Amino acid sequence: EKQSAENGEEVKVLRFSAIPDEDTTAQKERFQPVADYLSKALGIDVEFVPSINYGASVEKFENNDVQLAWFGGVTGVQAMSRVEGARALVAGQKDLAFKSYFIANVSTGLEASEDFPAAIADLKFTYGSSSSTSGCIMPSHFIIENTGKTPMEFFKEKPGFSGAHDKTAMLVQDGSFQAGALSFGTYEKLVAAGKVDPEKCVKIWETPTYADYNMTAHPDLENTFGEGFLDKLQQALVDCQDEAALKALGREKLVKVNNETFSGIAAVMEKVKFD
């Protein structure tokens, strides 16, 4: 997008956002290093714009209020379907084999198993955001795959939506909900930080792997910064060795992907309904 400078010249700015998947109040602080890295690597102005929820990040992208976003699999597919020419550029190495954990409060008596935990049907269960790949859509897919029932048929009590992965873990740990599903990475990070006690908030099942997070770019960037800019942006992300930027994304390395990488998620989204 272009802004007018005081001298009348247009200042070109790349605006970047992200899904607020955890610690929703500290987004700008978290993602600023990514904006700083891209600004330096590409020699342009890059500004981080927070999103209040998952849906808002997709709306901003659709309206061209942001031209680059760190999406989950589901939000990425939504953005690609709404903006013709939108391109998934990179994912973390681990995003090509992402997984969800099903967790339960110790009081349920449920323990880790390789078998799908069918007993959660009777429990008070929470997802993360309804647009979360690892916190809702893929867990629901595996419920359907293992039981032949939609989540609304499977759970005796309507499931809750915490809005973010860390909130899911805390709500299950404190007993507000008896069980839940979340990103494996967030659970492991919270355990490592001592915020989640795995004896109280027990990992009971891990899903098979799927493709998830991605950095997706708006086609209008080529109008603003010139033809071939998306390739340059992709390369700058793949080349990123900036520790602060990679830490912000929770990734050790970024790898090239394309829209096809997420076709499996698109197919799952057609099947998972909460109506």
Put a short name on every predicted segment:
Residues 30, 34, 53, 57, ...:
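Stable alpha-helical elements in mature extracytoplasmic
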Residues 59-119:
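Acidic, polar ligand-binding/catalytic clefts
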Residues 11-39, 51, 97-170, 174, ...:
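Bilobed "Venus flytrap"/periplasmic-binding protein-like clamshell domains
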Residues 19-20, 92-101, 195-237, 247-264:
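Periplasmic-binding protein-like
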Residues 47-49, 158-160, 202-205:
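General small-molecule cofactor/ligand-binding pocket signal
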Residues 124-145, 231-275:
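Ligand-binding clefts/hinges and TM-proximal coupling segments of bilobed small-molecule sensing domains
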Residues 1-56, 245-275:
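N-terminal hydrophobic or amphipathic helices and topogenic motifs
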Residues 70-83, 144-145, 171-198:
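A ligand-binding cleft/hinge motif common to bilobed small-molecule-binding domains
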